[in-house]
Amino acid sequence: VDIMHQVDIIEDVAIAYGYNNIEPLWRELPTTGEAKPDQHLINVARDLMVGLGYQETLNTTLTNSETLFTKMNMPNSPLIELANPKVITMTCIRNWLLPSLMEFLSVNQSVEFPQKIFELGKVTLLDHTKETKTRDENWLAAATAHPNANFSEIKSTLDSFMVNFGVEWQIKESSNPSFIEGRVGS
């Protein structure tokens, strides 16, 4: 059964009736469409990353706690879980992007190096101040994989990215269980 949402039922009805039999209804009032205010910034960020030699990946927002925490050596933290997941690989909504990139690299190990990838996508965070108790944010993550990959390479990417947006920044040593101690900055 391929019914995960109300839209799936509507799609099945449309298929049964026949898409070619559906007459379009045109609005009487002219309307103009435009991108959301942050979409221009997102497009510029994507163009910058491509210009820096990265390929964009598009991963699903649904994932599982093993990918988010266990495989990333992170302690479990609160996240949004699906009430009735259909598959064990999609039981929650991602709250950060890096696990998706690592999974992408993992299944593409046979692809020729270097692999330089990024994702600019939505993550969903718990936010009890909101009516829905959640907040969607656009995040950017990048990864590079090849025998000579190092901190300087990814830092120079970040430097170029920030300079193009006119942002002054500096990196400070930090720690994260997903990375080797002493090789993490934020």
What is the predicted role of each segment?
Residues 1-115:
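Extended, well-folded interaction surfaces typified by the phenylalanyl-tRNA synthetase beta subunit core
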Residues 2, 6, 59, 129-136, ...:
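A carboxyl-terminal module marker
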